[in-house]
Amino acid sequence: MAQSTGSKKVKTAIFISATGSNLKSLIKFSKHKKSPIIINLIISNNSKAKGLRYSKIYKIKKKIFDFKNSLSEKKVINELKNNDIHLICLAGFMKILSKSFINNFKGKILNIHPSLLPKYKGLNTHERAIKNKDKYSGCTVHFVNSRLDSGKIINQKKVRIKKLDTPKNLAKRILIQEHKLYPAAIIKALSL
């Protein structure tokens, strides 16, 4: 993993598909003096993603790609390399990256997932945790590999499931923890 050296921060791209609440949290984290990252690029597969507004607010370059085929992915790879990106953080990015893409940035792609992996990979994590009467759910930051939500776990945070929880209110409580966990996981990942 690329390490930040002294005052030199790791150039980072954030991939989003929707609201960008983790993006906003990571931007705030990157502005801290002791943060090891600088966010140089926001990439989305959705031109209507609400999170793209942070590009204007924080003056960060944004690019939209459809990720529909290998040609599109090559354009993304070129954009990342042209911007000297050394860390990619997936933050609510709802596309599965190809093995070829992942191999281009092996060990440099992180993802945040709203469950305690390896439980509940994929979608509808909160519904499944409640349906199965789990006592805890939570969130996980992991390295991305070619298998869905299966990369090496960096950090996790447990959140107790309350008796009257709905998927929506459990998701809100987990999201609060995601905003704390992702920055800590980035620091840990960069030190590995």
Q: Which functions belong to the PLM regions below?
A:
Residues 1-192:
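One-carbon transfer enzymes
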